Amino acid sequence: MSLFSAKSKPAEVFPFTLTDAEWHARLSPEQYRVMRAHGTERACTSPLNAEKRHGTYNCAGCGQALFTTDAKFESGTGWPSFFQPMNEHAVGTTEDRGWGMVRTEVHCGNCGSHLGHVFPDGPAPTQQRYCMNGVSLDFQPA
């Protein structure tokens, strides 16, 4: 089933949904700006950049497991980076034509919250760099 947005294009329907008021109540102002309004946190501001413990990175909006430390790498970009999600359903992607460029936006596969972008310049085995906003992630140590 699909719905139509104000721009008359199909909008994806996600298993976990909340009203805008419920998202505002659930998320901090910065999380809402990034996750629901497709913002970007400043580089090098997330404590998750330096996180070295084993564990899982979940969506800060709905708790969906997204990435593990086994896929995390130091990209030098200032954002937590991973070479692959936990599984094919963890995240989704859409084309992002904002800011005068074409990028691939990454969102939570369960609630649709904006997580970051994926670029084709990561390490083996995928050559992908999932560049995530730390504020969109909730780290759970193993």
PLM regions: where:
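Short, contiguous pre-domain boundary segments
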Residues: 1-20
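A short Gly-Trp-Pro
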Residues: 14-142
